[in-house]
A protein has these predicted regions:
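Conserved beta-loop-beta element that borders a ligand/cofactor-binding pocket
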Residues: 82, 114-138
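Conserved C-terminal active-site "lid" loop/helix of NAD(P)H-dependent oxidoreductases
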Residues: 201-205, 225-254
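NAD(P)H-binding glycine-rich loop region in Rossmannoid oxidoreductase-like domains
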Residues: 1-64, 69
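A conserved pocket-lining segment of Rossmann-fold NAD(P)-dependent short-chain dehydrogenase/reductase
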Residues: 127, 147-168
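Mid/C-terminal beta-alpha module of Rossmann-like enzyme folds, strongest
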Residues: 176-231
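Conserved Rossmann-fold NAD(P)-dependent oxidoreductase catalytic core, especially the SDR/UDP-sugar
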Residues: 61-104
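Amphipathic terminal alpha-helices
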Residues: 258-267
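Glycine/proline-rich active-site loop of Rossmann-fold NAD(P)-dependent oxidoreductases
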Residues: 110, 123-125, 135-146, 179-190, ...
């Protein structure tokens, strides 16, 4: 609510909706210049397969609703996909041409990508897909997952920590959306990540060093699965070493914070 009030003070008109109730948002589409779909269904507690199915149900319903509405009134749609669509590729560099073999967190988005791209080709849906890495910035999931757990003495590296994570500062992600909404590169996908993917252990160490805290240890994946859920852990231990060259080349995008170490002081 406070965030909404802050936006209203900036002149933003809010339209509050429910992902599972299309009537609460589909009528807004004809009134805007473009639709940017960044919504994700929120769940609480341990991530189970059933909860992942709830996330997929919500995303499928909202994405299909928005794509139909955008087709009906010829509006541009920016769809937020994600790097989990690619699945585990070890040390290999991943580009937009890399085949999708999603980890659990990427299954719903992959399903929608496979629907949206044919709609772009065959029915001329004006859609552009953005695939952000793990987003960090003040507050949000980053604060919950890293800062809060570190303060409680609960932060741990998942498994061996040798898998790559590709990340992005929230301000750089916003800049990419601003460029994409002005683009006419319909049917294209852009990976939005910084210049330096990090192994998970290095990412966590960079964070604890910046906080002036003692480096943390690792936790076995089997124990993590008991605590937070198998599908989530299977996603977080995948290796996604993502290239951002296409977004730089075609959108003219350049991350202000090219590495995690550069961006942390601003957080």
């Amino acid at each position: 609510v406070r965030k909404g009030q802050a936006l209203e003070q900036l002149g933003v008109t809010l339209a509050v909706g429910d992902m599972l109730k299309p009537v609460s948002y589909e009528g807004v589409v004809p009134t805007v210049d473009a639709v940017i779909h960044t919504a994700q269904y929120g769940i609480q507690g341990r991530f189970t397969r059933k909860k992942f199915e709830q996330i997929e149900q919500a995303d499928v319903l909202m994405t299909r609703t928005l794509s139909r509405a955008c087709l009906a009134c010829d509006k541009k749609l920016l769809y937020t996909s994600g790097v989990f669509n690619y699945g585990d590729h070890g040390d290999e560099w991943i580009t937009e041409q890399t085949p999708l073999r999603p980890s659990p967190l990427g299954e719903a988005h992959t399903k929608m990508v496979e629907e949206l791209l044919p709609l772009s080709r065959e029915q001329h849906l004006r859609v552009i897909l953005l695939s952000p890495g793990f987003v960090y910035g003040p507050g949000g999931l980053f604060k919950q997952s890293f800062y809060d757990t570190l303060q409680k003495g609960q932060l741990r590296i998942f498994g061996k920590g040798q898998n790559y994570w590709s990340i992005i500062h929230v301000d750089d992600l916003a800049a990419a959306y601003a460029l994409a909404v002005e683009s006419e590169a319909y049917g294209e996908t852009y990976n939005i990540v910084d210049d330096q993917p990090l192994r998970l252990c290095d990412l966590v160490n960079t964070f604890t060093d910046a906080m002036g805290k003692k480096r943390v240890g690792a936790m076995a994946t089997w124990l993590l699965k008991l605590l937070i859920g198998g599908p989530l852990v299977d996603s977080l231990v995948t290796s996604f070493r993502i290239s951002n060259e296409k977004a730089k080349r075609e959108l003219g995008w350049q991350p202000r914070y090219s590495t995690f170490k550069d961006g942390l002081p601003e957080v």
